[in-house]
Design a protein with these regions (language model features):
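Alpha-helical transmembrane segments of secretory-pathway, organelle, and plasma-membrane proteins
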Residues: 1-46, 79-484
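Charge-rich, low-complexity intrinsically disordered and helical linker regions
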Residues: 49-87
Length: 484
């Protein structure tokens, strides 16, 4: 422990646990196979023939009809209005292992679990022994989770750009990306007295510290980049996030809409589901200064001598609220996934209202495709939650916040620069370590706590905003357009 440091020990332990325990226990597999999820089985050809009253074609008859579609004895047509009963069975590990994107789903969920444990253990340790002049390795784990989650969600979005039948989905992604880009540009011109973006303070701190660092290196510069350029690239990132969040939001909205129909009689559960669905909007309001911060930290109510909260307590409450909402939505995931699996039954019931005929293959594919894309739907559900959750973790650590709401003074390391003087092999390792430490100190001096609070705070707020707004658009679509 003394040689490697507590953070490295925690990381090595978690890597070892991840490697040894991964083959025996998987949270991703448990969520799909041990939470009571039920899938529907498609009817076999013999069952469909029996229901439709179609006699089985013998080989002799099929050979006598040259050019007939029944030569293989597989494809036949049945009435769409046919009452087809569906058998159900519980989802098992052997069923999900062959699903599309299952390996990506298992990796993202399990890695996020172990990264969460690393963050929790690091926070507990640093609560007793505060970190000094060290890199918090839990931030590396959080960044890896965000990177993996974004990569998988991008790969899912790219699927809409492949094939000629995805023109509508492709257009939706492009339009959503440009719409969110426009919204981000409008948000960035809002005064920080109304919206706590923190970008102005972050830019001023970054510009000043970067100019000071360049000056210490003998380079004369007033700043690395203009405010307009930095905000433009940040707006591009916002548009990118909005584009890849649009279909996860639509999918979550469809599952929520189906759940509301299922609990149509139980008003209490409908109310709780609606509160859970609207909870990201409440998180978005926590960054609107006149609505929340000024009301809770500045206003003194009658009969009181001080505001309800201090600024530090409000920041801690905001972080806790994001984490609670994210964990709550993860807790509800099996209910939403069951609502998705019930789509197979709903498709058959809706088909009974249609006229005409359908082939047995089309009916079987319509039912089987629901379960086939289960992991895709699960990824679309959990990745926006993981983005908000781990952005909150990074915001807490790099922003210098505390869980108790008590502000801790942050001391930036002084800018140091020294050139190596020794050249023998015995001091090479020490020189490399010293240069690495100086490089980290320089980065800390440039990317100050104000920069981290501004950038990560805005990233957290925008992820939450994109998460809710895409789901809200999905609810509008399901309510007024899909069933109009």
């Amino acid at each position: 422990m003394a040689l490697l440091g507590a953070q490295m020990v925690i990381t090595l332990i978690m890597v070892s646990v991840f490697q040894k325990l991964g083959s025996f226990f998987s949270l991703a597999r448990w969520l799909l196979c041990s939470t009571g999820l039920v899938r529907y089985l498609y009817p076999t050809d013999s069952e469909l023939r029996q229901l439709a009253g179609i006699p089985k074609v013998t080989k002799e008859k099929s050979k006598g009809k040259k050019g007939s579609k029944l030569e293989n004895g597989d494809v036949f047509r049945i009435p769409r209005s046919l009452d087809v009963p569906l058998e159900s069975t519980k989802v098992s590990p052997l069923d999900v292992v062959h699903l599309r994107f299952y390996s990506e789903y298992q990796w993202v969920v399990d890695f996020a679990l172990y990264a969460g444990f690393v963050f929790l253990m690091s926070e507990v340790y640093h609560g007793f022994y505060p970190i000094k002049d060290e890199v918090n390795l839990s931030t590396v784990w959080c960044m890896l989770v965000l990177g993996f989650a974004t990569k998988v969600l991008v790969s899912l979005t790219v699927q809409y750009f492949k094939g000629e039948q995805s023109v509508g989905e492709r257009s939706t992604v492009i339009v959503a990306a440009f719409a969110y880009l426009l919204i981000a540009m409008m948000v960035m011109v809002v005064d920080e007295r109304n919206l706590e973006s923190g970008l102005e303070t972050a830019y001023q701190s970054f510009n000043t510290s970067a100019a000071r660092f360049l000056g210490s290196q003998g380079l004369q510069s007033s700043g690395p980049a203009s405010k307009l350029v930095l905000k433009f690239f940040l707006a591009l990132w916002c548009g990118f996030i909005g584009g890849i969040f649009i279909f996860p939001g639509f999918r979550a909205a469809r599952m929520h809409y189906d759940l509301l129909k299922y609990y149509e009689v139980n008003r209490i559960k409908r109310f709780l589901l609606n509160v859970s669905f609207a909870s990201p909007f409440l998180l978005v309001l926590l960054w609107v200064k006149p609505v929340c911060r000024d009301y809770l930290t500045a206003r003194i109510f009658s009969g009181m001598t001080a505001p309800l909260m201090t600024d530090g307590a409000f920041d801690s409450m905001r972080l806790v609220a994001v984490i609670v909402v994210a964990l709550h939505r993860l807790f509800l995931m099996p209910i939403y996934l069951q609502a998705y699996l019930n789509m197979a039954y709903q498709r058959v019931q809706e088909q009974r209202k249609e006229a005409g005929r359908i082939t047995n293959r089309e009916l079987q594919e319509k039912i089987a495709s629901v379960f086939f894309y289960l992991c895709v739907v699960t990824l679309q559900y959990v990745i926006p939650i993981f983005c908000c959750l781990f952005f909150a973790f990074l915001f807490k650590v790099l922003g210098g916040f505390t869980w108790s709401g008590v502000s801790v003074p942050f001391e930036s390391p002084a800018l140091l620069y020294s050139s190596p003087t020794a050249t023998d092999d015995a001091t090479t390792i020490m020189q490399s370590a010293r240069q690495f430490t100086l490089a980290l100190d320089s980065l800390k001096q440039v990317f100050t706590i104000e920069v981290s609070r501004g950038v990560l705070g805005f990233a957290l707020w925008w992820s939450t905003f994109a998460w809710f707004s895409s789901s809200f658009l999905g609810i509008l679509y399901q309510t007024y357009f899909q069933h109009s």
